[in-house]
């Protein structure tokens, strides 16, 4: 009996091509995820700045007190226990320890420091809240 000559790929060839394709796809996903996490971290810092500036502007204007509570998964911006804004940390950004930053009715902030560690950028962010008019600085150090 003569074997018919059929055109097409064998099962082994198809499996080899699919395996290589899946492997290449998996290799490319990891850098994309890292880039996404870096962007999410940048967005977090912009939102943090916006929320902080809003808080130190509204508090003295209304003569109310304000607080920023730094928890393990989020920062909460509070104006006189009435208005709260939740800002969740992006994946890979971790708070060193719980902190509470108080803003007086006149808008003054006492000096304090909050520390974050980033698994994504491999940096330590040291936020130093300065005396007086609600200013802060972020210092970045290599982990």
Language model features by range: what are they?
Residues 1-32:
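N-terminal single-pass transmembrane signal-anchor helix
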Residues 3, 46, 127-130:
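Generic detection of intrinsically disordered/low-complexity segments and helix-coil linkers/edges
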Residues 10, 14, 31-33, 46, ...:
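Short, structured secondary-structure boundary patches
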Residues 34, 57, 61, 65, ...:
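N-terminal helix-rich module
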Residues 37-65:
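Membrane-proximal N-terminal amphipathic helix
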């Amino acid at each position: 009996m003569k074997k018919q000559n059929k055109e097409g790929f064998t099962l082994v060839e198809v499996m080899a091509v699919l395996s290589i394709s899946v492997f290449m796809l998996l290799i490319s996903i990891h850098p994309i995820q890292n880039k996404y996490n870096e962007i999410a971290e940048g967005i977090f810092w912009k939102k943090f700045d916006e929320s902080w500036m809003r808080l130190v502007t509204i508090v003295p204007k209304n003569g109310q007190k304000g607080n920023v509570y730094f928890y393990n998964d989020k920062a909460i911006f509070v104006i006189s226990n009435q208005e709260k804004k939740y800002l969740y940390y992006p994946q890979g950004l971790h708070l060193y320890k719980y902190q509470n930053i108080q803003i007086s009715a006149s808008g003054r902030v006492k000096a304090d420091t909050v520390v974050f560690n980033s698994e994504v950028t491999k940096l330590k962010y040291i936020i130093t809240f300065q005396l007086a008019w609600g200013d802060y600085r972020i210092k970045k150090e290599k982990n």
